[in-house]
C-alpha cells in the first residue's frame, strides 16, 4: 500500500503549464466568491463546488443528492461530486491567462535568473516585461542586433527605414518567452565554459553566475520558458477561507482579493482581444495583468504594494510562507497539540524527585480516553458512550479509575522559554486538590522556574513507545547532569543549602560540648531532649562492618554532622578509607556549602548512578528544609554591622586623592593618569572596606551565613549593605570618579542615589535587549547544527586535534585532565620517561586514565575530535566521545548538534551586553559578552581590529615623530613593515620572535585573516578559545565539544578556485566531502583534480548553505532559498531534524533513526516451551 509519508527524499522544481493543468480540477472563470443571498458558492467562481468539491459532507450544490449512500456520484444537475467536504483543502483550480506573464521570483530576485540566462540586464528586462520597450527577436537582414532594445520612437523609425516584415520585435512576457524558448542549454553551457577560460575580473564573475544558472536548468530538467506563466494555479479554497462574522459581514483571506484582481483583468483582456481593440489598450491591460500576477505571487516586491482597507498591504503567497507567522514557522515547525494543558506552578517539597502534582480536574480531562477505556474494561460502563457520559458528569467512581490509569503513566512538564533540553522533563503524576501544578524544588534550576506566578504546560505521551521513552530517558530523576558541562543541575538551592550549612557548622562553648555517647541513636535522643546543642563538639562510638569484620571506635563530630551524614553514602572518596584510623570517620566531615554539595552529588552520581543519587537528593532536600526552619535564620538591620575601620580608610583615601589632584594641577601628571589613579585608589579602598567588614562579621551572623553557604546573596551585596557601595558608571559606561561612600544600612544621600539610578536603569534595559538577542543567537545555532547526529560508531579517521592545558598568564584555567576525560586519543600516548604505552589509540579515557596521562608529565595530547571527524553526515561516536549528560559513551542516534546549540545559547542571557569603553582611547573599544560571541560565530570583521603579522620572524621597532613602525624580519632576511596607528597598544617588544598570525597590537583578530595565514586548523583553534574566553569570564562552563560541533559546521564548505576536469564550477561553494569525492573520481579516470580552499562561513550563511532546502527556507530568506532550489531542481535528502518535522515524519534521531526502525524480530515459535508462555506478561 502506498503511504503518503513513506518517502526518502523530496524534490522541488518549476511547474510546467501542463503540470498545472494536470493538478487542476477545473478552470476558475469568474471573480465571484459566494452568493450574498444564498451564501452558496457561485459556479465557476473562486469557491465553486464543481471544481473544488462540496461545502457540506455528502451533499451536492443543488441538493439533489444527500447522504453518504451517493458517495462518488457526480450530480447531473450541478456537476458536483458527492464526497467529503475536506477535499476542499486539497483540490486545486487554475486560471488560463490570455497572455503569458513572467514569474516575479525569477525576474526580480537577486541575481535575476531570467536576466542571467538571457544575458540581459534586469533593468532592460523590466522595460520589456512592463511594455516600455521592444526587444528585437530576429533582426533578419537588418543591422539591428538580437535582444537589442528599441523604444516606441526607434521602433517606428526602424519600420519606416527597413520595411514592415524586415525584422521581428515584440514586447511583454510573450517576447521574453520566445527568447527563453530559443535557448539551447547544451550549446550555451559549452560556449560559456570556453569563454570562462579566457576571461578575468568582473566579466569572469558574471560568466560564472550565468554558467551556474544554465547548468542548473540543464541538469534539473526544468525548461527556461517555464519561468513565464501561461496558467496560474488556484490554491484550494479552504486554505484561503471566507468566514461570516457576527454582523453578517464577511472576513476573507487576502489571497481571494489578489486572485479576483487577476481574474478580472484576465477576463477584460480576453474581451479586448476578441473585440480587436487598439494595440495601446491591449498593451496596458497586459501590463496590468502582469502587475496583478506579481502582486499575487509576491506583493510589494516591485513597485508599491497592493493595499486593502486601511492602507494595509495584502498578504501574498510569498508572505504566507515568510517570517515567524508564515507557514513554515507557524504551522509546520510550531504545531499545537492535543492532550495538553497549562496552569500556575506551586512548590511541592513533599514530592519525590520523579513526581509532580497534577490538579484533579486537569488530569481527568487529559487522561479522558484512558479513563473511558478503563471504565468499560472494569465493567463500570457498558460502552464508550456511557463511559464518556460518566466522565463528563464527573461521577465518584471516575476518580478511582483515574488513580489507576495515572499510576504508571508519566507526563511531560515544559516551561517556556525552553532554552535547553532540560526545559521538558517527565514526571510521575500525583493527583492534588486545587488548580495548580506542584513542582519538585530540585528541578527548578533546570527549568529556571520560580513560584512568583510562572506557568507550565503538561503534555501526555500517548503511545506505549512514547511512555517508555519518557520514563527511561526523560524522567527528572535521570536528568541530574547538565548536558553542557556534565555538572549536576539538580543541586539544592536557597533554604536547602542553608539548612545543610547550618547542620554541619560547629560552635565552641555550647550545651553538651565534650560529652561522649555510646551510639549515634543516643546522640539523636540527647538532641531531641535538648540535652546537647546541634553544633556541639562531641565524641561518639561508631560500629561499622568493613569487608565482613566489625570495626568500632570513637570519633569526634557534632550532632548536626551525624544527622546530615545519615542521607549520604559513606563511600564517596572524601576520606581515604585505606588508613585504619579513617575507617570510621563520617564521609562529610566539613562545612557544607552549595559548592561542596555539587561535589557530593557529582561523586555520588559517578559511583552509584542516577537512582541512588536522586534518593540522596530527596533526603538532603527534606533535611535542608527542616533545619533551615529550625535554625530560624533571618535578616535584621542589626545584622548589618558597619566596620569600625571604615571612617579611617575613607579619610586616608581622601587625603591621597587630594595629593593626586595637586600633582595634576602642578602639571606633573596628565588628565588621563590622574583619572586612572583616582579610580584605582577608590577601587582598592572599597575592597579594603569590604574585607574589614567580612572580617568583623561573626560566622553565625545570618547574612554572612547566607552568603557563605551560597544560599542567597554574595560578598559584593554584603559590601553594599554594610560597607560602601563604591564606584558607579555613568550612562555611557565610563566610571564616575566620585564613589558612593555610604552603604544601604546608613542610607544614600540625594546625589549618591541619583548616581546609582544610571546603573540600575541600564541594567533593566540591557536585560530586555539581551533576552531577544540571545534567543536569536540560539535559533541560528540550532539551524546551523540541527542535522549533526551521531550516525556511526567510528569514521576511521587517523587525524586528531592537539590539546594542552589552557593558561591565562600563569594561572591554569582548564587543566589537561578536563580536556582529556571522556575522549579517545588519536595516537598511542607514550610515557615520556619510561617509554611505555599508557593509553593505546582509540581507547576511551575516563577521568582516572586522563589523570594518569597528566601525572606522567605529558603536556600535549592528540585526541579524536569532532573537528577531524570524517563522517559525511553528522559525526561518529569515537570523535565525539562522552555524552556530558550521562557521563557514558555517546550512543548512536544522539542529536548532538541540537544539544551543542542549546548549551551555547542557554547561558547567552547570562552574558553581558556591554562594550567596554577605555576612557576615550581610539580604537580600543573591545566588544565583550554576547555581541562578541555573535561576532565570532558570524565570522564578522570585529570592532577594534588588531594588526596581525603575516610572517614569522623577529620584531624590530622604529619610531619617528610622525609614526611608529614595526618591522618583522623573517629568517631569510626579508622585511615586512606595519604602521601602527596612534592610540593602539603594542603587544610585542624589540627583538621578540613571533609566529605568523600573532597579534602585534592589542584587539581582536579578523578570523578570515587567521584562515588565510594559519589555515583551517588555526581558525578553528582561534574561534574555540575566543568563544570560551567570553563564557569563562562570566563563570559559565561549556564543554569544548559543543563549540567544536558548531565550528565544524562553519568550516564545511570549500570555495572552488579551479575546476580542473571536474564538473564543479569555479567560484561556487561545495561541501568538503563532495569536493573530495569529485576529485577522487576524476583522479581515478586520470584527469586533473579541482582546486579549492576552505571558506569560513558565519552561522547564518552556513545555515542557508545546507543541503536541505526545507531547513534553509524555514530559517531565513524563504523566497530566495526556494527560488534557487526550484531552478536547481534540488533534492532534499531529509537527513536533518527540521525537514522531517516539517513534512511530519519521525525525526531521524534517537529511536527514530532508520537503523532502529528497521529492526525485525524473528520469533522461532517451535522452540518456546509450553509452560514458559504463561509467565510472559505483555
From Swiss-Prot:
Pfam family membership, one: RNA_pol_Rpb1_1
Gene3D superfamilies in alphabetical order: 1.10.132.30, 1.10.150.390, 1.10.1790.20, 1.10.40.90, 2.40.40.20, 2.40.50.100, RNA polymerase II, clamp domain, RNA polymerase Rpb1, domain 3
The protein's Enzyme Commission number: 2.7.7.6
Enzyme class (EC, first level): transferase
Sites where the protein binds Mg(2+): 450, 452, 454
MF (Gene Ontology): DNA binding; DNA-directed RNA polymerase activity; magnesium ion binding; zinc ion binding
GO-annotated biological processes: DNA-templated transcription
The keyword Transcription is assigned to this record: yes
Cofactor(s) needed for function: Mg(2+); Zn(2+)
Entry keyword annotation includes DNA-binding: no
Entries under CDD domains matching the protein: RNAP_beta'_C (cd02655), RNAP_beta'_N (cd01609)
Xref: InterPro entries: DNA-dir_RpoC_beta_prime (IPR045867), DNA-dir_RpoC_beta_prime_bact (IPR012754), RNA_pol_asu (IPR000722), RNA_pol_N (IPR006592), RNA_pol_Rpb1_1 (IPR007080), RNA_pol_Rpb1_3 (IPR007066), RNA_pol_Rpb1_3_sf (IPR042102), RNA_pol_Rpb1_4 (IPR007083)
A Gene Ontology term for the protein's cellular component: DNA-directed RNA polymerase complex
Residue sites binding Zn(2+) 1 per the record: 60, 62, 75, 78
Catalytic activity from the UniProt record: RNA(n) + a ribonucleoside 5'-triphosphate = RNA(n+1) + diphosphate
Residues that, per the record, bind Zn(2+) 2: 795, 869, 876, 879
Swiss-Prot/TrEMBL keywords: DNA-directed RNA polymerase, Magnesium, Metal-binding, Nucleotidyltransferase, Transcription, Transferase, Zinc
Cysteine disulfide partners in this protein: none
Co-factor binding comment: Binds 1 Mg(2+) ion per subunit. Binds 2 Zn(2+) ions per subunit.
UniProt similarity note: Belongs to the RNA polymerase beta' chain family.
Function per UniProt: DNA-dependent RNA polymerase catalyzes the transcription of DNA into RNA using the four ribonucleoside triphosphates as substrates.
Subunit structure: The RNAP catalytic core consists of 2 alpha, 1 beta, 1 beta' and 1 omega subunit. When a sigma factor is associated with the core the holoenzyme is formed, which can initiate transcription.
Name of the molecule in the record: DNA-directed RNA polymerase subunit beta'
Organism of provenance: Clostridium botulinum (strain Loch Maree / Type A3)
Amino acid at each position: 500500500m502506498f503511504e503518503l509519508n513513506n518517502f526518502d527524499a523530496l524534490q522541488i522544481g518549476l511547474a510546467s503549464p501542463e503540470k498545472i493543468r494536470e493538478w487542476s480540477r477545473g478552470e476558475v472563470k469568474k471573480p465571484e466568491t459566494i452568493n450574498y443571498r444564498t451564501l452558496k458558492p457561485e459556479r465557476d467562481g473562486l469557491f465553486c463546488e464543481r471544481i473544488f468539491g462540496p461545502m457540506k459532507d455528502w451533499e451536492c450544490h443543488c441538493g439533489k443528492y444527500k447522504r453518504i449512500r451517493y458517495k462518488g456520484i457526480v450530480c447531473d444537475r450541478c456537476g458536483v461530486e458527492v464526497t467529503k467536504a475536506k477535499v476542499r483543502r486539497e483540490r486545486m483550480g487554475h486560471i488560463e491567462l490570455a497572455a503569458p506573464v513572467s514569474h516575479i521570483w525569477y525576474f526580480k530576485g537577486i541575481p535575476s535568473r531570467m536576466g542571467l540566462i538571457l544575458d540581459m540586464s534586469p533593468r532592460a528586462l523590466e522595460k520589456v516585461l512592463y511594455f516600455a520597450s521592444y526587444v528585437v527577436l530576429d533582426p533578419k537582414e537588418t543591422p539591428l542586433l538580437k535582444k537589442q532594445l528599441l523604444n516606441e520612437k526607434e521602433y517606428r523609425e526602424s519600420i519606416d527605414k527597413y520595411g514592415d516584415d524586415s525584422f521581428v520585435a515584440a514586447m511583454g512576457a510573450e517576447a521574453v518567452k520566445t527568447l527563453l524558448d530559443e535557448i539551447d542549454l547544451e550549446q550555451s553551457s559549452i560556449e560559456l565554459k570556453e569563454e570562462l577560460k579566457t576571461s578575468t575580473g568582473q566579466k569572469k564573475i558574471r560568466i560564472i553566475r550565468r554558467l551556474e544558472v544554465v547548468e542548473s536548468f540543464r541538469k534539473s530538467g526544468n525548461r527556461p520558458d517555464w519561468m513565464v506563466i501561461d496558467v496560474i494555479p488556484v490554491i484550494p479554497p479552504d486554505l484561503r477561507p471566507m468566514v461570516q462574522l457576527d454582523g453578517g459581514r464577511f472576513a476573507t483571506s487576502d489571497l481571494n482579493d489578489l486572485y479576483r484582481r487577476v481574474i478580472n483583468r484576465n477576463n477584460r483582456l480576453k474581451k479586448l482581444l476578441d473585440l480587436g481593440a487598439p494595440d495601446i489598450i491591449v498593451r496596458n491591460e497586459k501590463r496590468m495583468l502582469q502587475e496583478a500576477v506579481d502582486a499575487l505571487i509576491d506583493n510589494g516586491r516591485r513597485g508599491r504594494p497592493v493595499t486593502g482597507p486601511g492602507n494595509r498591504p495584502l498578504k501574498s503567497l510569498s508572505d504566507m510562507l515568510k517570517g515567524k507567522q508564515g507557514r513554515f514557522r507557524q504551522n509546520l515547525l510550531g504545531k499545537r497539540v492535543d492532550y495538553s494543558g497549562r496552569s500556575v506552578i506551586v512548590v511541592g517539597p513533599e514530592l519525590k524527585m520523579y513526581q509532580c502534582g497534577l490538579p484533579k480536574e486537569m488530569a481527568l480531562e487529559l487522561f479522558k480516553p484512558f479513563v473511558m477505556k478503563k471504565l468499560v474494561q472494569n465493567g463500570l460502563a457498558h460502552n464508550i458512550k456511557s463511559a464518556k457520559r460518566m466522565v463528563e458528569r464527573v461521577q465518584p467512581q471516575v476518580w478511582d479509575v483515574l488513580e489507576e490509569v495515572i499510576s504508571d503513566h508519566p507526563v511531560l512538564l515544559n516551561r517556556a522559554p525552553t532554552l535547553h533540553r532540560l526545559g521538558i522533563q517527565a514526571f510521575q503524576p500525583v493527583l492534588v486538590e486545587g488548580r495548580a501544578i506542584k513542582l519538585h524544588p530540585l528541578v527548578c534550576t533546570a527549568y529556571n522556574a520560580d513560584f512568583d506566578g510562572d506557568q507550565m504546560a503538561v503534555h501526555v505521551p500517548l503511545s506505549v513507545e512514547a511512555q517508555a521513552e519518557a520514563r527511561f530517558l526523560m524522567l527528572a530523576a535521570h536528568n541530574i547532569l547538565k548536558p553542557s558541562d556534565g555538572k549536576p543541575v539538580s543541586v539544592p538551592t536557597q533554604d536547602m543549602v542553608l539548612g545543610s550549612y547550618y547542620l554541619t557548622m560547629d560552635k565552641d562553648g555550647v550545651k553538651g560540648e565534650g560529652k561522649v555517647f555510646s551510639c549515634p541513636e543516643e546522640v539523636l535522643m540527647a538532641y531531641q531532649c535538648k540535652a546537647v546543642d546541634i553544633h556541639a563538639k562531641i565524641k561518639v562510638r561508631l560500629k561499622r562492618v568493613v569487608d565482613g569484620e566489625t570495626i568500632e571506635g570513637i570519633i569526634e563530630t557534632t550532632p548536626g554532622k551525624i544527622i546530615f551524614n545519615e542521607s549520604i553514602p559513606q563511600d564517596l572518596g572524601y576520606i581515604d578509607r585505606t588508613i585504619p584510623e579513617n575507617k570510621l570517620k563520617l564521609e562529610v566531615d566539613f562545612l557544607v556549602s552549595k559548592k561542596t554539595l555539587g561535589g557530593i552529588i557529582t561523586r555520588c552520581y559517578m559511583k552509584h548512578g542516577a537512582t541512588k543519587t536522586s534518593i540522596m537528593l530527596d533526603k538532603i532536600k527534606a533535611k535542608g528544609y527542616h533545619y533551615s526552619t529550625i535554625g530560624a535564620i533571618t535578616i535584621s538591620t542589626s545584622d548589618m554591622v558597619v566596620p569600625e575601620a571604615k571612617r579611617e580608610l575613607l579619610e586616608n583615601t581622601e587625603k591621597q586623592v587630594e595629593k593626586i589632584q595637586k600633582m595634576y594641577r602642578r602639571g606633573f601628571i596628565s588628565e588621563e593618569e590622574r583619572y586612572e589613579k583616582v579610580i584605582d585608589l577608590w577601587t582598592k579602598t572599597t575592597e579594603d572596606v569590604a574585607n574589614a567588614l567580612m572580617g568583623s562579621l561573626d560566622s553565625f551572623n545570618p547574612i554572612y551565613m547566607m552568603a557563605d553557604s551560597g544560599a542567597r546573596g554574595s560578598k559584593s551585596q554584603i559590601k553594599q549593605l554594610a560597607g560602601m557601595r563604591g564606584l558607579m558608571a555613568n550612562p555611557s559606561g565610563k566610571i564616575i570618579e566620585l564613589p558612593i561612600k555610604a552603604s544601604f544600612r546608613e542610607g544614600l544621600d540625594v546625589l549618591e542615589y541619583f548616581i546609582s539610578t544610571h546603573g540600575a536603569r541600564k541594567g533593566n534595559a540591557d536585560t530586555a535587549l539581551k533576552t531577544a538577542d540571545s534567543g536569536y543567537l540560539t535559533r541560528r545555532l540550532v539551524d546551523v547544527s540541527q542535522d549533526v547526529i551521531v550516525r556511526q560508531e567510528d569514521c576511521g579517521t587517523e587525524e586528531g586535534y592537539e590539546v594542552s592545558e589552557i593558561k591565562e598568564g600563569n594561572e591554569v584555567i582548564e587543566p589537561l585532565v578536563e580536556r582529556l576525560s571522556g575522549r579517545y586519543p588519536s595516537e598511542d600516548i607514550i610515557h615520556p620517561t619510561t617509554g611505555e604505552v599508557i593509553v593505546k589509540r582509540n581507547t576511551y579515557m575516563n577521568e582516572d586514565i586522563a589523570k594518569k596521562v597528566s601525572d606522567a608529565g605529558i603536556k600535549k595530547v592528540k585526541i579524536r575530535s569532532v573537528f577531524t571527524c570524517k563522517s559525511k553526515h553528522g559525526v561518529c561516536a569515537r570523535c565525539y566521545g562522552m555524552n556530558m549528560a550521562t557521563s557514558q559513551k555517546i550512543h548512536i542516534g544522539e542529536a548532538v548538534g541540537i544539544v551543542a546549540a542549546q548549551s551555547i545559547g542557554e547561558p547567552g542571557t547570562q552574558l553581558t551586553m556591554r562594550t567596554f569603553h577605555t576612557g576615550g582611547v581610539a580604537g580600543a573599544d573591545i566588544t565583550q559578552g554576547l555581541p562578541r560571541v555573535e561576532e565570532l560565530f558570524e565570522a564578522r570583521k570585529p570592532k577594534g581590529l588588531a594588526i596581525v603579522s603575516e610572517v614569522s620572524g623577529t620584531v624590530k621597532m622604529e619610531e619617528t615623530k610622525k609614526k611608529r613602525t614595526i618591522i618583522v624580519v623573517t629568517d631569510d632576511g626579508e622585511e615586512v613593515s606595519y604602521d601602527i596607528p596612534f592610540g593602539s597598544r603594542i603587544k610585542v617588544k624589540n627583538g621578540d620572535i613571533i609566529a605568523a598570525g600573532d597579534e602585534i597590537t592589542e584587539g581582536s583578530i579578523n578570523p578570515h585573516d587567521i584562515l588565510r595565514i594559519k589555515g583551517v586548523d588555526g581558525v578553528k583553534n582561534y574561534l574555540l578559545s575566543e568563544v570560551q574566553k567570553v563564557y569563562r569570564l562570566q563563570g559559565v562552563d561549556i564543554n569544548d565539544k559543543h563549540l567544536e560541533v558548531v565550528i565544524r559546521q562553519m568550516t564545511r564548505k570549500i570555495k572552488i578556485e579551479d575546476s580542473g576536469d571536474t564538473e564543479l564550477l569555479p567560484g561556487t561553494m561545495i561541501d568538503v566531502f563532495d569536493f573530495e569525492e569529485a576529485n577522487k573520481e576524476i583522479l581515478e579516470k586520470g584527469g586533473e583534480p579541482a582546486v579549492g580552499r576552505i571558506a569560513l562561513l558565519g552561522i547564518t550563511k552556513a545555515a542557508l548553505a545546507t543541503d536541505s532546502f526545507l531547513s534553509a527556507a524555514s530559517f531565513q530568506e524563504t523566497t530566495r532559498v526556494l527560488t534557487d532550489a526550484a531552478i536547481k531542481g534540488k533534492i532534499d535528502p531529509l537527513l536533518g531534524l527540521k525537514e522531517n518535522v516539517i513534512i511530519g515524519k519521525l525525526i531521524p534521531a534517537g529511536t527514530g533513526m532508520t537503523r532502529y526502525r528497521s529492526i525485525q524480530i524473528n520469533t522461532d515459535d517451535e522452540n518456546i516451551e509450553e509452560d514458559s508462555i504463561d509467565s510472559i506478561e505483555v
